[in-house]
Amino acid sequence: MEDWKPLLDAIGSAGRVSAMTGAGVSTLSGIPDFRGPQGLYKNPDAERIFDIDWFDRDPSVYYRGCRELVYGLGEFSPGPVHLALKRLEDAGRLDGIITQNIDMLHQKAGSSRVWEVHGSPILHHCRRCGAARSFGEVMAMIEANGGAATLGEPYVPRCSCGGAYKPDITFFGESLPEVAFARSQELAANSDVMLVLGTSLTVFPAAGLPRVTLQRGGKLFIVNAQPTPLDDFAAARYSDLAEFAAAVMSAFPAGR
């Protein structure tokens, strides 16, 4: 058992607390890490699946590669870290969440201040006319045409104008969501404590956000199974996310 007292004391006493989450948080819900041994990036077509030029050329590459991973996200439930962060928000001890994940599980857990720096499939937009559809609407279109896991050529949901619907996930060749990243920078700059959870801090520019907290005099508490470039600068370093969640739930009981 790791010593969580320094982290819990900091959460309890800090003026402003934020959290930054990565793939490790969602693997506890059963969602594979894109960069892990069984992840999407082991797919030989990985670079094309999330490439905006490829999507505009042939959107079926994306819908083939992600029909189960992205359009099966509705089957997953929030894990212990998602629920622990919701508990901290309810206790008035968390000002916001910056997430690199696209699975929408923080919102599913009930967290209200979530900034998705790599975007989210919660909305899809037509690449031709810009019309918007919700994740649920696109899912309904996919299910009506064979479902997410159907073998053979994937169904590509299209607008009435003929354009393909693309999720608001940031593809290679696209900029990060402007509003979400600006709000994330503001949150990081104003944090007395940032909890860095389940991310190895290797994907920029998002990985630079904890540095903003450090530069402004804030403290980092890192919980990640693998080393990160900022371990030596953290106030404390831990490895077990499930233990972190249990410690938070114990220290901040519901209703208090």
PLM-predicted stretches and their roles:
Residues 1-256:
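Conserved catalytic core of sirtuin-type NAD+-dependent deacylases
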